[in-house]
């Protein structure tokens, strides 16, 4: 994905005047925060920002970015076990609920 593609995607989203943007991961959220700052869009006053993956990167931004925190190792282990079960012809649950915590920081207040 090029910078131009990301810029085009952001412009298309901003044209819809969202209240909040939820990013797939910490790096995207971090880069988006920088781009919003460059565009003089104030977070959270004009637009809230959050990530589906938490890391130290997000707590160090200004404002700090809200995120979902989960045990990535446990999630990966569960996914691997389920995949092995499928490959072995075993039945697996249609839904597997994992624990998580929403970390509210300044970017969504």
Regions found by a protein language model. Name each.
Residues 1-4:
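Short beta->alpha junction loops
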Residues 9-109:
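Flexible loop/turn connectors
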